[in-house]
Amino acid sequence: MSRKIARCVFASVALLILSSTGYAAGDANAGKEKANACTSCHGVDGQGSEPNTKIAGMSVGNFKKAMQAYKSGERNHAMMQMFAKKLSDQDVEDLAAYYTAK
């Protein structure tokens, strides 16, 4: 019985490790370095002011969804589409981590 439990624990840990290795989480420090282009419209800390959106404190999911929508053209804003199309997936992850922490 204890061998069966040990195998289950081992399998569970292995699955957790394998499932997390393919995901590149955002790096807030790298995001801070990449955020310079955002400051002219959204402010130094992402607080924004009308008509620009507040991105500080935005959830990672919402930030990523918005950037993808600008990249694909689903959201129509010429300036944001131009910036978003230049961002790699890792750039978006890093920026999301940075602004979520604000």
Language-model region placement:
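Gly/Gly-Pro-rich "capping" loops immediately C-terminal to redox-active cysteine motifs
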Residues: 28, 46-75, 81
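Soluble non-cytosolic domains of exported or imported proteins
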Residues: 29, 57, 86-90
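C-terminal capping alpha-helices of c-type cytochrome domains
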Residues: 66, 70-72, 83-102
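Detector for the c-type heme attachment site
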Residues: 41-47, 100-101
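Bacterial N-terminal signal peptides that target proteins for export
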Residues: 1-10
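Cleaved targeting-peptide boundary
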Residues: 23-33
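The canonical Cys-X-X-Cys-His
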Residues: 36-44, 95
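N-terminal signal peptide c-region/cleavage motif recognized by signal peptidases
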Residues: 18-21
